[in-house]
Every structure is written in C-alpha cells, then in structure tokens.
C-alpha cells in the first residue's frame, strides 16, 4: 500500500510532481495492500499464457506461413493445440497460481516494492539485462541436469512429448519442472530487486521469449534476430527434434553457454550437413535444368 493519502502528499514526499504514469499507478494501487498488488502477477501470467501464443494457432491452422515452418512434416490441428492449452491451464491453476501466492513472503523478504517512485527506463533496462543473464546461466545447468537419465525419465520427458514444439507447449511440463525452473526466473529479481512492475515486465518478456522459441517457425523478420547470441526458434527446435537423447542446445535464451561448454557441437554438425544437402539439391536442379 502506498503510504500517502493523496497525490499531493506523494509529490511532497518525493520532492517533485508525479509523472503521468505515477499518478495512474497511485490512483490504482493506493488503497490496495501489497499482497493484493502482488496477486496481479497471476493475472499477468494468465494473459501471457493465453493470448501470446494465439497468433501462432492462426498461423498453424491456416498454413499461411508454412514456408517458415521448421519441421514441415508435422502439422497440428486446432483440437491438438486446444488440448495443449487445456493441459497448460491445469498446470497454471494447480501449480503456477498457487506458487505465486505462497511465494509472497519471499517477495517481501528480497525487497521487491510496489510503491512510489516508479523506476526509470534506464533502471528497468539494466535490471532486465541482469535478470536475463542470470536466468539464462542457471537455467542452462538445470536443463543439462534434466537431460541426465533420472532427470529426463522422471521429470523432463513430459516437456519433450512435443518433438516439434508449438507456442502453447512452452510451459507444458511436469509440475516439478515448473517449480524447479521457477528458481532461475526468481533468482535475478532476488539478487537485484526492483519494482513490481519491472517484475511483471520481466516474467512477461521471459514467457514471450519461451513462446517464440517454441513456436516452430523461424520468421526472418523477427526482431529477436538482432539480439547478440540469441538462440531463437530454429536453435531450440533442434533440441526438441533430437529428443531425449539430446545433449545439445540447452540454452534458455542465449547461446554462449552451449558454445563455451561444447554442447552445441551436434547442432553445428547438423547445420553443416544441412547446408551441404541444400547445395547438392540446388546443383542437381541446375544440372537438370541445363539437360
């Protein structure tokens, strides 16, 4: 709860006038408890899980962009995708939503705030960079562990039921995997705590990234292609394509860990063979044309 009865009192306490965004935030949250504000995290995640993958459903259903589909032989029906969404929503209600509620004391403990002032753009960007780097590194090692015999058979194999991933399948996993992977997601905000709005932006962007990575489509116009060391859909799709025996492409977001620790060798060999195959097919077409 914001400890100021009016906007004027808040302005006096801050020593300046509130920005437009701060005024809107004050009007909305001033009478709400910190716990009530934090519970909005559940709504944020529900909207992201439900709405962000939906355009990919249209893309898959219509076939308008099949030229960009990575595994072209695999096609999902509307029924398949709706079934995946239902399973994800069960996980959301039973695991994700519950986890958000019971984790509130840890939010208080690390110092994630919901009052004024709101963070500056530079503060938000700096914290998001830290969060992505911390999550990526810790997620890499947890993901590698999940591909050991016990971790895969007992937990991670459920996520790999989709050998050709789709957007709604990004959070499709064993309940234990959801809980375990919550650790790297929360670790960044725990180390560099910020505002609850930054926290919401962080978990939203992380889910957007996961949905794109599991989209099954490699769109050439994606702005994420401009991000250095970004893995993306084609990179992660190989991991799902290989399946349970995969010891390659564990990266959550960036590819540097796979490169440093040598877990992208299979992928690089695959890319070379694919490139060689494409060249041979192009040469065969050229020869046939001249004949």
From Swiss-Prot:
- Cofactor requirements of the protein: Fe cation
> Which tissues does the record link to its expression?
Expressed at low levels in leaves, roots, siliques and flowers.
Extent of motif Histidine box-2: 156-160
Q: List where the motif Histidine box-3 lies.
A: 235-241
Keywords in alphabetical order:
Endoplasmic reticulum, Iron, Lipid biosynthesis, Lipid metabolism, Membrane, Monooxygenase, Oxidoreductase, Steroid biosynthesis, Steroid metabolism, Sterol biosynthesis, Sterol metabolism, Transmembrane, Transmembrane helix
Assigned GO CC terms: endoplasmic reticulum; endoplasmic reticulum membrane
Membrane topology per record: Multi-pass membrane protein
One GO term in the molecular function aspect is: iron ion binding
**Which ranges carry the Fatty acid hydroxylase domain?**
128-263
Its Enzyme Commission number(s) read 1.14.18.11, 1.14.18.9
> What does it catalyze?
4,4-dimethyl-5alpha-cholest-7-en-3beta-ol + 6 Fe(II)-[cytochrome b5] + 3 O2 + 5 H(+) = 4alpha-carboxy-4beta-methyl-5alpha-cholest-7-ene-3beta-ol + 6 Fe(III)-[cytochrome b5] + 4 H2O; 24-methylidenelophenol + 6 Fe(II)-[cytochrome b5] + 3 O2 + 5 H(+) = 4alpha-carboxy-ergosta-7,24(24(1))-dien-3beta-ol + 6 Fe(III)-[cytochrome b5] + 4 H2O
Q: Does the keyword RNA-binding apply?
A: no
Q: How does it assemble?
A: Interacts with ACBP1.
Q: Under which name does UniProt file this protein?
A: Methylsterol monooxygenase 1-3
Q: What organism does the UniProt record list as the source?
A: Arabidopsis thaliana
Task: Quote the gene name from the UniProt entry.
Answer: SMO1-3
